[in-house]
């Protein structure tokens, strides 16, 4: 048995002590986690800057602050979330009462990506702790400084058999995903998600897969162009475009395309200044592999660049870039971009825009900028997507009352707030039947009972 397998079985053994099922224990662990995150704030911010070039305002808002809010909400609501529910019982089961009890799955695996390497570890972990599970965490090896901070934070806060961090790369991940966990929560690319899903199926392990895809932005002829440009630029270029729900491409009505490009270009200068490479507010690409993938896409679209296009390998810097005259068969439209390159396509009618999106895999997010209520209702009702926003981008993630998750190729399962608790919770149903009375209609011998059975099931 290798060390990873040993840690797994130690975690299973800890769960079997029943400690984690106590509600006061769970609340105390969440309190300890909040305190630890606050004490590690400067280390977390420094690691995020080193690995991704994240400005501390952006890093705190998208990684630390939102996590602390989530912990606070879970501690506040936990008593209600964990209540056993008494549900209605049909008359033909008299004298019986029916219940749904919330219980933890057991030992869960959380695999996190590099783009929000702190938040995307702890958001699912909050749900796992709140639900009463033990957990093993696999942070991204592409953000090693953040991973080391997470390991120190967890090791100093929790019993290693309760919450454990496994650092490493592909080999360690392969070992983990083939173990018989009680639940696997994965955030990352579609290709890796398929590998995780296949491995989990060997042990019939339930999974949540949070992936991505090409999330579109529709800008129609009624849109407030200034507002649209600001909110699209925020959503696309935060974290240098390395956000799973970032706008991947724009579908703009042909009558307002030029106005939108002008507004986007102006907004980018307002956000990051004339020399964007010198801006303290603009991030960097996580590593050279992803940098070269993105510059290859840029090189294939040199004739389409209307803003940006510059890059610097030494800094892993890619300038925010706008591409015009893009078509559906362009190289940039064949994969999720996951970087600061924004293709712009046009449409003539809403029917055309809806058909374009219908022809592609269901996106993780979709955004519409419009003042037309009919257009809004058509997009919401006719298109399938994980989540989204009307006249905004990204911000649907900030509401813990909303579930977040994909559909189709963009993922399965949902989390955030109570939905995180539900994800890591098995709803166990049972009945309690009195021994004082037995009608006996369902028991042999059946002679003379047919009319009573029909009466019980009468519609």
Where are these regions (language model features)?
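Residue-level signal for inorganic ion chemistry
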Residues: 26, 71, 132, 163, ...
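Rossmann-like NAD(P) dinucleotide-binding subdomain of oxidoreductase/dehydrogenase enzymes
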Residues: 91-227
């Amino acid at each position: 048995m290798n060390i990873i397998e040993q840690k797994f079985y130690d975690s299973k053994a800890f769960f079997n002590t029943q400690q984690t099922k106590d509600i006061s224990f769970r609340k105390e662990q969440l309190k300890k986690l909040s305190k630890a995150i606050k004490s590690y704030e400067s280390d977390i911010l420094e690691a995020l800057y080193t690995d991704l070039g994240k400005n501390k305002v952006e890093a705190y808002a998208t990684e630390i602050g939102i996590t602390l809010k989530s912990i606070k909400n879970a501690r506040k609501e936990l008593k209600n979330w964990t209540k056993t529910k008494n549900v209605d019982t049909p008359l033909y089961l008299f004298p019986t009462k029916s219940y749904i009890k919330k219980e933890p799955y057991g030992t869960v695996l959380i695999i996190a990506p590099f783009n929000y390497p702190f938040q995307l570890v702890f958001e699912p972990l909050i749900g796992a702790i709140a639900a009463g599970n033990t957990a093993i965490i696999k942070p991204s090896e592409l953000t090693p400084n953040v991973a080391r901070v997470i390991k120190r934070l967890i090791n100093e806060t929790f019993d290693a058999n309760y919450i454990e961090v496994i650092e490493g790369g592909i080999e360690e991940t392969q070992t983990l995903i083939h173990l018989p966990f009680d639940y696997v929560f994965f955030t990352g690319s579609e290709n890796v998600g398929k590998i995780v899903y296949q491995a989990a199926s060997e042990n019939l392990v339930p999974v949540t897969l949070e992936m991505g895809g090409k999330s579109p932005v529709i800008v129609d002829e009624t849109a407030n162009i200034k507002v649209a440009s600001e909110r699209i630029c925020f959503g696309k270029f935060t974290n240098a475009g390395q956000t799973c729900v970032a706008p991947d491409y724009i579908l703009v009505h042909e009558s307002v395309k030029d106005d939108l490009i002008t507004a986007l270009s102006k907004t980018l200068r307002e956000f990051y200044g004339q020399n964007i490479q010198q801006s303290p507010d603009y991030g960097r690409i996580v590593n050279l592999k992803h940098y070269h993938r993105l510059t290859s896409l840029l090189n294939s679209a040199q004739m389409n660049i209307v803003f940006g296009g510059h890059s610097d390998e030494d800094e892993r810097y890619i300038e925010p870039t706008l591409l015009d005259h893009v078509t559906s068969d362009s190289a940039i439209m064949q994969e999720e971009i996951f970087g600061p390159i924004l293709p712009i396509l046009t449409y003539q009618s809403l029917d055309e825009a809806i058909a374009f999106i219908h022809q592609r895999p269901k996106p993780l997010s979709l955004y519409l900028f419009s003042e037309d209520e009919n257009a809004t209702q058509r997009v919401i009702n006719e298109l399938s997507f994980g989540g989204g926003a009307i006249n905004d981008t990204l911000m649907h993630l900030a509401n813990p009352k909303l579930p977040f998750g994909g559909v189709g190729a963009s993922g399965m399962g949902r989390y955030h707030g109570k939905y995180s608790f539900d994800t890591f919770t098995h709803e166990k149903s049972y009945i309690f039947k009195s021994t004082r009375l037995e009608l006996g209609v369902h028991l042999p011998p059946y002679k003379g009972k047919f009319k009573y059975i029909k009466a019980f099931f009468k519609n």
